[in-house]
Amino acid sequence: MNNILSFEINEIRNILQGWGEPSYRADQIFDWIYKKLVLNPLDMTNLSKTLRQKLLEYFSFQIPKVVRITGDGNTKKYLLELEDGENIETVLISHKNRNTVCVSVQVGCPIGCKFCATGLIGLKRNLETHEIIGQLMVIQEDLEKKEEKISNVVYMGMGEPLANYDNVIKSIRIIKEEWGFNIGSKHITLSTIGIIPKIYQLAEENLKIRLAISLHASNNELRSKIIPINKEYPIEELLESAFYYAEKTGRRVTFEYVLIKNFNDRREDAKELVRLLKGKPAHVNLIPWNKVREYPWETSDLKDIFRFKEILANSGINVTLRISYGSKIKAGCGQLRALYLKNKGETI
């Protein structure tokens, strides 16, 4: 059965017209779903009983099931169960009047970065559009209790967004549009390890969302050690695609850089990063590595983190240090899989 959360409004209009219904019924249906959070068509009282019954028979209105919620201050991690029994994790960060949702796009991840917990799962499957949108529905329902709304969406959860391109792009359109979640492009960020052909394709979509590149090293030798796909998509070509995206969209690109002790946090690493990015439409987001016990790495010392940041800032690079919200509940960068394995009965 088709899940209605996978459809854009024009697709629903076409289906309704085939049923002999006026196209404005689609607007009413989506108002119930995205504005009133009503997922039972029988409760859509401005529709005829016949149409309500037809919607119930033709579409699924299912969203992921909440298995467990863990909280740490302003961060909540949701373990969700999909219809086939697979699990994903979604994170809500509430900070300074913002509610940012970090969505997953795959069950597991195919990239296998050598510092990230999600990659240890491997790839189970891609998420469908409705499974991405369903994560937002779950969290918006939770926020409604406080009369709050989702303000930002980041594609930084489990999986590589550009490896599930079609479903991710469709979900972005649903999030952006007024009939959907009505969240503006500048409040949507897609983070990618750097699948270069898809970055060029994304630039042509005219979505104008924010792009974040998971760089994590300033030269190919180091990056290839922790990001296997770098051998296929080396740094120089990756930067070229990123700056093409910036030129096409008018948005500077964020480069995420996880700091790992005595690996990529040295003075020379910072200076090499300056040479790559100086004078470019770039912003660097430094992220202290969050411990994953299967890997031998350690988090950089604070003095080295601040030295790295200072070298970039003094060289004219826009740089911020990300506070790792949620690391205590394993909801921080690179940690999404602990609840997944626990729910599957595996050792973590």
From Swiss-Prot:
Binding site for S-adenosyl-L-methionine: 159-160, 191, 214-216, 290
PROSITE patterns, sorted: RADICAL_SAM
Binding site for [4Fe-4S] cluster: 109, 113, 116
Record localization: Cytoplasm
Reactions catalysed according to its record: adenosine(2503) in 23S rRNA + 2 reduced [2Fe-2S]-[ferredoxin] + 2 S-adenosyl-L-methionine = 2-methyladenosine(2503) in 23S rRNA + 5'-deoxyadenosine + L-methionine + 2 oxidized [2Fe-2S]-[ferredoxin] + S-adenosyl-L-homocysteine; adenosine(37) in tRNA + 2 reduced [2Fe-2S]-[ferredoxin] + 2 S-adenosyl-L-methionine = 2-methyladenosine(37) in tRNA + 5'-deoxyadenosine + L-methionine + 2 oxidized [2Fe-2S]-[ferredoxin] + S-adenosyl-L-homocysteine
Disulfide partners: 102-333
EC number in record: 2.1.1.192
Cofactor(s) listed: [4Fe-4S] cluster
Enzyme class: transferase
Main localization of the protein described in the UniProt heading: cytoplasm
SUPFAM superfamilies listed in its UniProt record: Radical SAM enzymes
GO biological process, one term: rRNA base methylation
Keywords: 4Fe-4S, Cytoplasm, Disulfide bond, Iron, Iron-sulfur, Metal-binding, Methyltransferase, rRNA processing, S-adenosyl-L-methionine, Transferase, tRNA processing
One Pfam family here: Radical_SAM
GO MF, any single term: rRNA (adenine(2503)-C2-)-methyltransferase activity
Cofactor details (free text): Binds 1 [4Fe-4S] cluster. The cluster is coordinated with 3 cysteines and an exchangeable S-adenosyl-L-methionine.
Active site: 89 (proton acceptor), 333 (s-methylcysteine intermediate)
Domain Radical SAM core: 95-328
Top-level division of the source organism's lineage: Bacteria
GO CC annotation: cytoplasm
Function: Specifically methylates position 2 of adenine 2503 in 23S rRNA and position 2 of adenine 37 in tRNAs.
Remarks, miscellaneous: Reaction proceeds by a ping-pong mechanism involving intermediate methylation of a conserved cysteine residue.
Family: Belongs to the radical SAM superfamily. RlmN family.
Entry protein name: Probable dual-specificity RNA methyltransferase RlmN
The organism of origin for this protein: Dictyoglomus turgidum (strain DSM 6724 / Z-1310)
